[in-house]
Each structure stands twice: as structure tokens, then as C-alpha cells.
């Protein structure tokens, strides 16, 4: 079997609240780390989320 092209990643909040989203990305086309602006319900604002490893 071939290795899957999509991998699961964890998007950690940069606000320091500990909130995160789990999503997937194509490892072949998106080789750099992903950063996305999403809603953080702990601080009730849109903040930047950066990619981290799923432990």
C-alpha cells in the first residue's frame, strides 16, 4: 500500500489559551507550516493558529 498524501495536523492557538483545531492537509503540495486565522472561543476573538504535531 502507498503512503497517504493527506496527514492530520493540529492547529494551536497563538493566544496561549490551549485551544486547538484538528484538520488535514496535503503533505506533498503544502510543504511549509500552515497558519490560519480562526475563531478562538476562549478569548472570543479571531486569532492566528499555527500548525503543530498531534501527540
UniProtKB/Swiss-Prot annotation:
Family of this protein: Belongs to the bacterial ribosomal protein bL33 family.
Record has Membrane as a keyword: no
NCBIfam families per the UniProt record, alphabetical: PRK00595.1, rpmG_bact
PANTHER family: 54S RIBOSOMAL PROTEIN L39, MITOCHONDRIAL, LARGE RIBOSOMAL SUBUNIT PROTEIN BL33M
HAMAP family: Ribosomal_bL33
Organism of origin: Ruegeria pomeroyi (strain ATCC 700808 / DSM 15171 / DSS-3) (Silicibacter pomeroyi)
SUPFAM superfamilies: Zn-binding ribosomal proteins (SSF57829)
GO biological process: translation
Key words, A-Z: Ribonucleoprotein, Ribosomal protein
Protein's name according to its UniProt entry: Large ribosomal subunit protein bL33
GO CC aspect terms: cytosolic large ribosomal subunit
Gene name in the database record: rpmG
Pfam family, one: Ribosomal_L33
Gene3D superfamilies in the record: Ribosomal protein L33 (2.20.28.120)
Molecular-function annotations in GO: structural constituent of ribosome
Amino acid at each position: 500500500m502507498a503512503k497517504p498524501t493527506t496527514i492530520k495536523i493540529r492547529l494551536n492557538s497563538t493566544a496561549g489559551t490551549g485551544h486547538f483545531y484538528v484538520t488535514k492537509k496535503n503533505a506533498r503540495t503544502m510543504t511549509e507550516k500552515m497558519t490560519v486565522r480562526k475563531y478562538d472561543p476562549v478569548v472570543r476573538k479571531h486569532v492566528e493558529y499555527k500548525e503543530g504535531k498531534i501527540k
